[in-house]
């Protein structure tokens, strides 16, 4: 779900910079010398197993037919994956949930004035692409969880349809009240667009794919090239997932057969206005019929028209009607029991459902997971037994709303809180560079893994290639110096958009999200053209980056499962949180300065005097100056976290010295018991304001960004949204969570100091 176009993989998961301190030993963090040698032998055997030929055949099978939630092939794929897991020698089963998943019965977008035009709302098959013609099995082009509606209204173009765009429209004197808005994809997660439109009084929303973003502006369109063709449409969910993901009717609990459910009319995550997506072929006549003010330069796409804002004279009729029945989900769960610590779990997942055939999204990420499982089966036959329990999951229902992972996490929340060591996620996988997002306590760990993986194109390590890219992309001498001198690649904070969300942000499980990408590009996201033919023509055609992902994540899972001491590092976490703290303090000051300056300009009459009399802008509203915010609780907690992180590093260094014999002492199990709670301590029982499902105090999807992360979200969004009355309370809540984490790390350090005084 989270990948919108291959060209954006690097930015969606983040540019890889460099930071953090090196591991306390030259060998594996959390391992004695002898254990590290044995571990490296097992890891080498694991990395020898994944085969590009196997990956290709898995993809051919899994993407052969459309397999959306509730479809026959979705269940068939789940049963096939189950058989594969069992064939590899793993204990596996299917867990079923019943979720609300609407599918369309009626869809209409038509221009009724000043001329007539009826949108196709249909993607045509392509000659030479056999699966593109499976129309009877394909989901129509639609946005899931759009409310039913039938409206006719003037049309207004709102650019990306994010809050800043509406502020600009208001300055230009343009209202969307009572109108249907048309917004282009990108700029935010799609569900934000109808949400913000409804908040401003719109009665309907159309979302279209402009060729500026993923069409002919970038190159040849499919089938001649990889980019979105004229009639290609991006399906997708518009549920208000910043409130909560998963089944709209069972927030916070697993959607089992007997679960207590909300009525559909009570579900707050369903849109307030009807929504439909269209192609740029269907959008062009609608946009061309608009008059009024010419759109600002940065609002103009690549269609051969004058982009105007409206409202009108274009009037549009929009109708959406769906089947609102429950559909079954099939989560495929495999388990390898731990031999020493069976109640400590390392969980690995990728989803198996798609909007249509889904070769890129999600099968390119799923097939490496299957090869990892096959590799574990071979290791088991050779006598390997993991120290901890390993759980492999092929999730259903990710595309509509992270359904399968969220319902599984909610159903097993207590067990996960007690047992989960880490969750490792992937989604789509492409050619290019290793992209990493996740918990900063795992930053050093995943860097060490990346140093052991070979890039299939350059034969460098994937770590070294990413470092060199950071140097090449640096925009200043200081940035280049930092890229060369820092020890580790800095990983990105995670917002939402894939199955890591419930693990990290609801339960507080340390998380990594991994994938390759950034080379090439494409515009087939969530369309019928995301299929085996497209992928094997334009993407990782030799499947060598699929093999690299299996080697990367397989090694990471194995290393986490076998470590004597969990390989978290907290100095990187402390440094990152300190950076976030400085950011929000600066944000508060900048917001105060901005309001003070704007109010002064209003007093001076600046906006009226400088407005074009022929196209006058409305002066902005006056804001009251924000109150003083007391950041002391956050600063003090960050300082405490930094101190105990350094203490823990010293203690671990002593424990791993002289061969690491101290790691065999009984005190070490108490260390792991404490470490297991470190990410959990970063959550708060109350959760975030107006969305208590999200509990993490450091990472959350933005209320108005969707996928995009907000760090220290309670504090940051209080400032951004000018909810000053919440500011001090959120600073206090974040400070308490950070202090609780520092206390947990201090207990772990004390236990290590007992083992190695």
Model regions and ranges:
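Soluble metallo-hydrolase cores and metallopeptidase-like ectodomains found primarily
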Residues: 133-168, 243-360, 374, 378-382
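Alpha-helical metal-binding/catalytic segments enriched in His/Glu/Asp
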Residues: 211, 332, 348-402, 407, ...
């Amino acid at each position: 779900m989270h990948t919108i176009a291959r060209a954006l993989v690097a930015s969606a998961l983040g540019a890889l910079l460099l930071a953090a301190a090196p591991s306390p030993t030259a060998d594996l963090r959390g391992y004695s010398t002898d254990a590290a040698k044995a571990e490296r032998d097992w890891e080498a055997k694991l990395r020898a197993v994944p085969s590009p030929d196997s990956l290709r055949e898995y993809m051919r099978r899994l993407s052969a037919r459309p397999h959306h939630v509730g479809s026959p092939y979705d269940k068939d794929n789940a049963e096939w994956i189950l058989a594969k897991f069992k064939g590899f020698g793993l204990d596996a089963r299917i867990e079923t949930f019943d979720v609300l998943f609407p599918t369309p019965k009626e869809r209409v977008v038509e221009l009724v004035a000043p001329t007539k035009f009826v949108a196709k709302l249909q993607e045509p098959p392509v000659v030479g692409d056999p699966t593109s013609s499976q129309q009877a099995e394909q989901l129509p082009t639609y946005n899931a969880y759009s409310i039913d509606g039938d409206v006719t209204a003037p049309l207004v173009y709102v650019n990306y349809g994010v809050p800043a765009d509406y502020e600009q429209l208001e300055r230009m004197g343009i209202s969307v009240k009572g109108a249907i808005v048309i917004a282009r994809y990108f700029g935010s997660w799609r569900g934000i667009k109808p949400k913000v439109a409804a908040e401003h009084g719109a009665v309907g929303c159309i979302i279209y794919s402009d060729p500026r973003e993923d069409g002919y502006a970038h190159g040849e369109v499919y089938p001649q090239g990889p980019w979105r063709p004229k009639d290609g449409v991006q399906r997708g969910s518009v549920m208000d997932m910043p409130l909560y993901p998963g089944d709209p009717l069972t927030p916070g609990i697993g959607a089992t057969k007997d679960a207590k459910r909300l009525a559909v009319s009570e579900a707050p995550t369903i849109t307030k206005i009807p929504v439909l997506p269209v192609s740029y072929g269907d959008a062009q006549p609608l946009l061309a019929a608009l008059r009024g003010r010419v759109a600002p330069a940065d609002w103009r796409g690549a269609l051969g028209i004058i982009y105007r804002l409206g409202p009108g004279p274009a009037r549009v009729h929009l109708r959406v009607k769906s089947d609102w029945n429950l559909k079954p989900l099939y989560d495929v769960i495999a388990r390898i029991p731990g031999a020493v610590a069976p109640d400590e779990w390392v969980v690995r997942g990728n989803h198996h459902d798609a909007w249509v055939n889904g070769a890129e999204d999600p099968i390119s990420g799923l097939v490496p997971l299957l090869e990892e499982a096959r590799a574990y089966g071979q290791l088991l036959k050779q006598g390997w037994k993991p120290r901890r329990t390993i759980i492999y999951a092929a999730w259903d229902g990710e595309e509509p709303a992270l359904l399968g992972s969220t319902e599984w996490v909610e159903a097993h929340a207590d067990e996960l809180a007690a047992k989960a060591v880490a969750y490792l996620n992937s989604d789509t996988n492409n050619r290019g560079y290793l992209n990493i997002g996740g918990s900063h306590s795992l930053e050093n760990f995943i860097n060490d893994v990346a140093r052991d993986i070979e890039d299939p194109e350059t034969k460098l390590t994937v770590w070294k290639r990413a470092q060199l890219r950071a140097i090449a992309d640096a925009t200043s001498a200081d940035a280049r110096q930092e890229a060369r001198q820092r020890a580790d690649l800095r990983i990105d904070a995670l917002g939402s958009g894939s199955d890591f969300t419930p693990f990290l942000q609801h339960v507080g499980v340390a998380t990594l999200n991994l994938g390759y990408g950034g080379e090439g590009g494409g515009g087939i996201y969530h369309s019928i053209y995301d299929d085996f033919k497209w992928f094997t023509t334009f993407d990782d055609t030799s499947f060598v980056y699929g093999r690299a992902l299996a080697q990367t994540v397989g090694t990471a899972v194995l290393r986490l499962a076998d470590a004597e001491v969990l390989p978290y590092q907290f100095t990187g976490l402390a440094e990152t949180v300190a950076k976030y703290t400085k950011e929000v303090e600066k944000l508060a000051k900048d917001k105060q300065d901005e309001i003070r300056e704007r109010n002064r300009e209003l007093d001076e009459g600046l906006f009226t005097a400088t407005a074009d009399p022929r196209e006058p802008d409305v002066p902005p509203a006056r804001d009251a100056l924000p109150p003083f915010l007391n950041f002391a609780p956050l600063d003090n907690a960050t300082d405490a976290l930094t101190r105990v992180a350094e203490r823990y590093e010293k203690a671990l260094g002593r424990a791993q010295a002289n061969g690491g014999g101290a790691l065999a002492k009984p005190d070490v199990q108490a260390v792991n018991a404490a470490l297991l709670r470190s990410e959990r301590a970063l959550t708060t029982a109350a959760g975030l304001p107006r969305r208590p499902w999200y509990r993490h105090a450091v990472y959350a999807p933005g209320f108005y960004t969707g996928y995009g992360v907000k760090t220290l979200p309670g504090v940051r969004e209080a400032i951004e949204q000018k909810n000053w009355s919440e500011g001090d309370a959120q600073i206090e809540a974040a400070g308490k969570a950070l202090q609780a984490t520092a206390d947990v790390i201090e207990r772990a350090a004390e236990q290590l100091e007992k083992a190695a005084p």
